[in-house]
A protein has these predicted regions:
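Predominantly soluble domains enriched in secretory-pathway, periplasmic, or organellar proteins
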Residues: 1-180
């Protein structure tokens, strides 16, 4: 990017299969991609998050973290010490053998360029969207089928479900937060 011009530098990165979302850490040192697997969604098999070293010349994939079946939404906290991958877990495919009523979050600790899965948290039906509040104290997860958002509390790398939700008039497939 130079001013108002964007050029393709012909740098393709071999992320995992079907990369769906990309999130860049606030430090600008790493990016994460949600690799949804062979089906491009939930298929009963585990999938990964690719870790991209943006400081390497050229940037490259330095790790993959197994997160669960069908990572879709992806968010990194404002401090950059924790991320979440929204896991479909079969919640989009009721007749399938791998169906689960609810999806989950894979909570990922970020320490420099090392990313580690630390726990899973169950959320609602077909979760897709995730965003941290600007102050980093809360995380909102959009549950598409339930037409609501789960509200989770964030304390450092510890994320817990408050048990509270708020309804929306549509199906939350994505979400963004603004500082104002």
């Amino acid at each position: 990017v130079a001013g108002d011009k964007v050029t393709y530098e012909k740098l393709d990165l071999p992320t995992g299969l079907w990369p769906f979302n990309v999130a860049v850490a606030p430090s600008g040192k790493i990016a994460l991609t949600a690799d949804s697997g062979d089906a491009g969604g939930s298929d009963g098999s585990v999938d990964t998050i690719s870790v991209v070293d943006l400081e390497a010349q050229p940037p490259r994939i330095v790790d993959r973290v197994v997160v669960g079946d069908g990572p879709e939404g992806l968010a990194i906290s404002p401090k950059g010490d924790v991320a979440v991958a929204v896991i479909l877990a079969g919640s989009n495919n009721k007749p399938a053998y791998f169906y689960h009523r609810n999806g989950s979050l894979a909570v990922l600790r970020i320490d420099g360029k090392k990313v580690t899965k630390i726990k899973d948290i169950e959320v609602g039906g077909l979760p897709e969207a995730a965003a941290f509040t600007p102050d980093g104290r809360y995380l909102l997860v959009g549950n598409y089928l339930d037409q609501d958002f789960s509200i989770l509390r964030v304390n450092g790398t510890n994320i817990t479900d408050t048990g509270k939700r708020f309804k929306v008039p549509g199906h939350p497939a994505s979400v963004r937060m603004s500082p104002r």
